[in-house]
Amino acid sequence: MTTDTASNGNGSAQQQSPSLNILAQYVKDLSFENPGAPRSLQARDRSPSININVNVNANPLAENDFDVVLSLSAQAKDGDKMLFNVELAYGGVFRVAGFPQEHMLPLLFIECPRLLFPFARQIVADATRNGGFPPLMIDPIDFAQMFAQRMAEEKVRAQVANTNDTAN
């Protein structure tokens, strides 16, 4: 990795200050299913159970450019009957420069999805409202906790793989 430098006017050089820029945001995939309509739109005695899943993926595009995709899916059920299913993959192209290598994964898996989340949340709310239901306002997500859990799971997988390799 190269370090960009700039002159500060007295002949000495200084490192480029860290920067994170959003180059683009986009809907990669959006699906809304309302299989029981119009019966599913009738008033209910109780609130439906809602199951929400969240995932984050990041892939390099160029030296400092990354594609980060926040995937949200939500299913609402009344007993065993599905009321709706919404799935969204919302992406952003980020330019990341001047950060130490050890900060890159947390930046891509915590900060980038944190910037994308309000937009993805609004798209899901609009889709459920347009489907005839009250808007689904997803609670804020702790991306730092998700990242820590992901790293712990990868560490366990690596340990299991090492154990299996030494056993053979």
Curated annotation (Swiss-Prot):
This protein's UniProt keywords: Chaperone, Cytoplasm, Protein transport, Translocation, Transport
GO terms, molecular function: unfolded protein binding
A Pfam family annotated for this UniProt entry: SecB
Disulfide bond entries: none
Gene3D superfamilies: SecB-like (3.10.420.10)
Subcellular location field: Cytoplasm
Cellular component terms (Gene Ontology): cytoplasm
Single Gene Ontology BP annotation: protein folding
TM regions (residue ranges): none
Quaternary state and interactors: Homotetramer, a dimer of dimers. One homotetramer interacts with 1 SecA dimer.
Family designation: Belongs to the SecB family.
Function in brief: One of the proteins required for the normal export of preproteins out of the cell cytoplasm. It is a molecular chaperone that binds to a subset of precursor proteins, maintaining them in a translocation-competent state. It also specifically binds to its receptor SecA.
Name this protein carries in UniProt: Protein-export protein SecB
The organism of origin for this protein: Rhizobium meliloti (strain 1021)
Protein encoded by which gene: secB
